[in-house]
Structures are given as C-alpha cells and as structure tokens.
UniProtKB/Swiss-Prot annotation:
Protein known as: Lipoyl synthase
Boundaries of every Radical SAM core domain copy: 56-270
The protein's required cofactors: [4Fe-4S] cluster
Pfam name, any one: Radical_SAM
Similarity remark: Belongs to the radical SAM superfamily. Lipoyl synthase family.
Gene for this chain: lipA
Group of enzyme by EC: transferase
Catalytic activity reported: [[Fe-S] cluster scaffold protein carrying a second [4Fe-4S](2+) cluster] + N(6)-octanoyl-L-lysyl-[protein] + 2 oxidized [2Fe-2S]-[ferredoxin] + 2 S-adenosyl-L-methionine + 4 H(+) = [[Fe-S] cluster scaffold protein] + N(6)-[(R)-dihydrolipoyl]-L-lysyl-[protein] + 4 Fe(3+) + 2 hydrogen sulfide + 2 5'-deoxyadenosine + 2 L-methionine + 2 reduced [2Fe-2S]-[ferredoxin]
Domain of life of the source: Bacteria
Entry GO terms, CC: cytoplasm
Protein residues bound to [4Fe-4S] cluster 2: 70, 74, 77
UniProt EC number: 2.8.1.8
C-alpha cells in the first residue's frame, strides 16, 4: 500500500477503517422481518450499504420503491439492470404499513430509475409519499429521487407532495460523471437540485470519493452545490460492490473526510456528513432540521 496526501492507493485489501459490523440484535431482526413480510425492497440490501448494521440496529431503513430492477446501468451501483416489472399498485400502502409497524420517526425513500414509464415513476412516488403521510402524519420524510430526465413538471410533483427533505445525488465530480453514471448528466442533476432548493424545501446531495477525482474537483463540486443553495451534502468512500462494477482508484483516509466536512461547513452547508462509510441516508433524521 502506498500513502500520499491522505490517500491510500487501491489494491485488493480494504483498510481497517472500512471494517463494518453485520446487522444484529432484535431491532435489526424486526426491520428484516417486516421487509420480508411486505415483500419490500431496501437500498440497504440491494446497494450493499456498509451502514446497514448501524441503521437496522436503530430500527431505521431506506425503502426502495418502483421495483428492484433499474433501467440504467451506473458503473458504481449494485442494483440489477434490465426490464423492470410493472409498478406494484399496493406498494404505497405496503410501505406506509411498514413505517407504522416499525414505529419510525423518520423514513427515507429512494427508487430505481424507471425510464420505461411515461412519467418515469413520478406519480407512483407521489402516491407513496401521500400514503406514508396519511398513515403516519408525525413521521418526517426524506426522498432520494432520480433525475426524471430533467423534467421540471415531474420534479414539481415531488415538491408539491411536501416531504421534509428532497435529495438527488451528483454521485461524482463533473469530469467523471460521464464515465460513472448512466444516461445522467452533471448539469441535469444541478438543474434538478436548483429547482428543489428554489422551492424552499431542504435540498440535499452527495458524492463518492475514490473514483479518481482531485481535491480541486471536490471543492468545485461543493461550490456548484452552494451556488444553487443546496443545504446538505454527504461525502463517502466508494466501495466496489462486485467485480462487475468500476474499480476503486483510492481509499481516502478518515482525516481527509473530516477536512472536507469542515471546508463544507465553512462554505455554508447546514450539514455535511463526511466519512469513509457515509452514504446518502446516513444520519438522515438530522437533516430535517437544516
């Protein structure tokens, strides 16, 4: 392993700071059982999230709606790509019942991309949000949405459903975006985020490190987000979920993540979650207050 400027060049062995705990305990089992009973999808499992153990022990989970097969093929993502099944009309109520059964105080929703549907799944998104709010009106909500191919009217549908936080991830810096993301552009994502921020709702985005980006590019991405008044940013280490995915270029040391957190706060973000194991929904309940 070679060390330089806070980075560890990648080989097949992960550094010690990336060791994670497997999901254990009663609350973790309860979440797992509820998900199985209602035949739900979670990004916790589909995306091989390293925080699954921590979140499930706290009785929280990020539900993935619109199926578990994505119409895009981003090189970093572990979610299967292909031709999805039709949307499940019972999903809104099933999600709402699960949120109630788990006694969640804050829920995070995300989805696969559904480019096969006329409205890319936006109306289904609204049905799920409304079902959860009707069933559990005191539960706060974050929604991590796709880009809806940049259609403002579809993004407006999500805004009008009034979740407390709307998140959309840039995923990486501008230069790497065409190589890492599938059928998505950096500028389209910024446009979506600006529309969210302009609505007055909490706007949130995130990027992964370790894909070959430079420090200057990371700071430029922060500036791009602050220019459109994005309030919350997450920064985490990219971890290759399988040999089919893009390789990790480097492992960023924890102290470098902490430095980026401080820089982000100085640039005006209300919250910056930055660490090797940070993912989009990490400590998501805090971001409602931003």
């Amino acid at each position: 392993m070679n060390f330089k400027a806070g980075f560890m060049t990648c080989n097949q062995r992960k550094p010690d700071w990336l060791k994670i705990k497997l999901p254990t305990g009663e609350l973790s089992q309860e979440v797992s059982n509820t998900i199985k009973i209602h035949k739900l999808n979670t990004i916790c499992t589909s995306g091989k999230c390293p925080n699954q153990g921590e979140c499930w022990r706290c009785g929280t989970a990020t539900f993935m709606i619109c199926g578990n097969i994505c119409t895009r093929a981003c090189k970093f993502c572990n979610v299967p790509t292909g031709c999805p099944l039709p949307l499940n009309p019972n999903e809104p109520m099933e999600i709402a019942q699960s949120v109630e059964a788990l006694k969640l105080k804050h829920v995070v929703l995300t989805s696969v991309d559904r480019d096969d549907i006329k409205d890319f799944g936006a109306s289904h998104w609204v049905k799920v949000i409304r079902a959860v709010k009707q069933k559990t009106p005191n539960v706060t909500m974050e929604v991590l949405i796709p880009d809806f191919q940049g259609h403002e009217d579809l993004v407006s549908m999500i805004i009008e459903a009034k979740p407390e936080v709307i998140s959309h991830n840039l995923e990486t810096v501008r230069r790497l975006s065409p190589h890492v993301r599938s059928r998505a552009t950096y500028d389209t994502s910024l446009k979506v985020l600006k529309q969210i921020a302009d609505s007055g709702l909490v706007c949130k985005s995130g990027i992964m490190l370790g894909l070959g980006e430079t420090r200057a590019e990371i700071l430029e991405t922060m500036d791009d987000l602050r220019k459109i008044n994005c309030k919350v940013m997450t920064i985490g280490q990219y971890l290759r979920p399988s040999i089919k995915n893009i390789e990790v270029k480097e492992y960023v040391r924890p102290e470098v993540f902490e430095e980026y957190k401080q820089i982000g706060l100085e640039k005006g973000f209300s919250f910056v979650e930055s660490g090797p194991l940070v993912r989009s929904s990490y400590h998501a309940e805090k971001h409602v207050l931003s």
